């Protein structure tokens, strides 16, 4: 019966599980792929979720994508990814293309967008979840951590350990708002103790171990009195740690180090770099649950989910 075939090919079709399995097995043997355009025309939506992220070249966003994919696995929804390279104009263009396909939802990194992109999100007519950050207003829902609080907590931990002459190493990409907020929170934490950053070293482009080595050598040559280096991410922090160890610098006695993100790469280092977990996989899962209508709150949209990262002192902050 044609109707049974149609229902069997739908994720939530009104047929028994045994019938569905027979239909799907027959389709597999025939190499048949259903044409979903007709259904999309009828519903004015496709079963796609637009996911817009700044990069796939670092270790952060692939784990976010894993969380999204895991949560959407049996919902009939499929994530489609667009990459912005931290460019607001590129984000605007990617969002325009995504929305032209009438997706069932949008997951987008960050809270800062161009006026045109913000207007498109506000008028999307589907669940919109801004991820990775909660330090600011959101269009619909947001899932992430407070980067200002993350920087603040790291500063307090460093000060408790007795470090006083502190340098910051990070990106100078003006559109990396989350790194900027962490630095603002970090400086606020230092100010609580009457301290301030004594030196800063910035880079442009992607994060890499080599960049971390070069930046660490540069800042310590310029300011050898520094006793702590706070890196904006784990990748450059790992490079800094390797440079210090190769040059016989006592870590964490002579100098302490910390990064951010809690990436798995740190498990392979000679010493564990102090870091803070950015809850990447959980952010992906919670965002996808909102889009799929599976939020534990029962709400569809209008949610603000703040996750709490964990500070791991590793082997590079002195024990208090």
Residue locations for each model-derived region?
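Hinge/beta->alpha junction and helix N-cap segments in small-molecule ligand-binding domains
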Residues: 54-63, 81-90, 143-153, 169-215, ...
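Short, well-structured alpha-helical segments in soluble
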Residues: 89-102, 210-225
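Flexible loop/hinge segments that line or gate small-molecule binding clefts
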Residues: 86, 109-153, 173-174, 195, ...
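N-terminal helix-turn-helix DNA-binding module of bacterial transcription factors
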Residues: 1-47, 318
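Flexible loop/turn connectors
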Residues: 217, 222-320
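Central regulatory/effector-binding core of bacterial HTH transcription factors
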Residues: 70-116
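Periplasmic-binding protein-like
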Residues: 102-110, 167-170, 202, 223-233, ...
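Interdomain hinge and pocket-entrance segments immediately C-terminal to HTH DNA-binding domains
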Residues: 34, 43-57, 75-77
């Amino acid at each position: 019966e044609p109707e049974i075939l149609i229902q069997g090919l739908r994720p939530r079709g009104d047929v028994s599980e045994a019938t569905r399995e027979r239909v799907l097995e027959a389709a597999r043997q025939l190499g048949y792929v259903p044409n979903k355009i007709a259904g999309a025309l009828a519903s004015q939506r496709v079963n796609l979720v637009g996911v817009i992220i700044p990069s796939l070249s670092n270790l952060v966003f692939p784990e976010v994508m894993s969380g999204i994919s895991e949560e959407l696995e049996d919902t009939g929804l499929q994530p489609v990814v667009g990459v912005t390279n931290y460019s607001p104009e590129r984000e605007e263009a990617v969002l325009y293309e995504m929305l032209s396909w009438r997706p069932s939802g949008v997951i987008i990194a960050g809270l800062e967008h161009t006026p045109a992109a913000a207007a498109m999100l506000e008028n999307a007519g589907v669940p919109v979840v801004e991820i990775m950050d909660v330090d600011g207003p959101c269009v619909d829902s947001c899932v992430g951590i407070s980067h200002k609080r993350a920087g603040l907590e790291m500063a307090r931990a460093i000060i408790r350990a007795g470090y006083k002459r502190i340098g910051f190493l990070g990106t100078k990409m003006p559109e990396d708002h989350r790194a900027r907020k962490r630095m603002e929170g970090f400086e606020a934490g230092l100010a609580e103790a009457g301290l301030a950053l004594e030196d800063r070293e910035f880079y442009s482009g992607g994060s890499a171990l080599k960049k971390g080595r070069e930046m660490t050598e540069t800042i310590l040559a310029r300011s050898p009195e520094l006793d702590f280096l706070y890196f904006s991410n784990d990748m450059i922090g790992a490079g800094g740690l390797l440079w210090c160890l190769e040059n016989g610098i006592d870590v964490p006695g002579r100098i302490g180090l910390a990064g951010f993100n809690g990436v798995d790469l740190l498990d392979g280092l000679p010493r564990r770099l102090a870091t803070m977990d950015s809850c990447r996989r959980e952010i992906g899962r919670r965002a996808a649950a909102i889009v799929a209508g599976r939020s534990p709150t029962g709400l569809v949209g209008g949610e603000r989910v703040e996750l709490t990262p964990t500070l791991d002192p590793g082997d590079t902050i002195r024990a208090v």
